[in-house]
Amino acid sequence: MFVTFEGIDGSGKTAQLTAAGEFLKASGKQVVLTREPGTISCIRDYVLASDMDIRTEALLYSADRAENIAKNVIPALNAGKVVLQDRYLDSFLAYQLADNKLVETDIMRLFEFSSQGLRPDLTLLFDLTPACAQERLENRDRIERKPIDFHSKVRNIYLKLSADNTDRIRVIDASQSFSKIHQQVIYHIERKLGGTHSA
């Protein structure tokens, strides 16, 4: 099963992904944790630190995705493992569209090519206001330092995507306590896996 964790910077999705991975491993599941970008370390370092043309940025993200899907995600899924990924389709759409420089058809064309058309079985969207998220962030990278209006656009795009994809995306209120959020994460994952767990 392929589960993606989405949300604006500072929403807490990465910490929840780590906690979910530990829980599933303790439950006897084989789990692989991945992130986007991150497969090709030099690409991650470059896109998070350098100003660049929006097309260059989209292509670099896509190159990293292509490598991750081919080398990590698909082999793990074929082996029956649970893949938990930090950012994927919805982040790519939300952040690229928020810049208002690329059209959705071009973004999706890049995504389809780089992802081999692979869609998540489940997406957990950690929703938080940009003002609250900004308070949590320290040592911000290039994207995290963008104006709050940009992050508001990203959040609104995420929420629209969730409304358009209710079969796949589950929205979680990220202003709750860590333990409450964790319970909801496990509930949604186990429900998708076919198990039972009370939220």
From Swiss-Prot:
It comes from the Bacteria. One of its GO terms (cellular component) is cytosol. Keywords: ATP-binding, Kinase, Nucleotide biosynthesis, Nucleotide-binding, Transferase. It comes from Tropheryma whipplei (strain Twist). The keyword Coiled coil does not apply. GO terms for molecular function: ATP binding; dTMP kinase activity. Phosphorylation of dTMP to form dTDP in both de novo and salvage pathways of dTTP synthesis. CDD domains: TMPK. It is an enzyme of class 2 (transferase). Belongs to the thymidylate kinase family. It catalyses: dTMP + ATP = dTDP + ADP. Its EC number is 2.7.4.9. This is Thymidylate kinase. The keyword Nucleotide-binding applies.
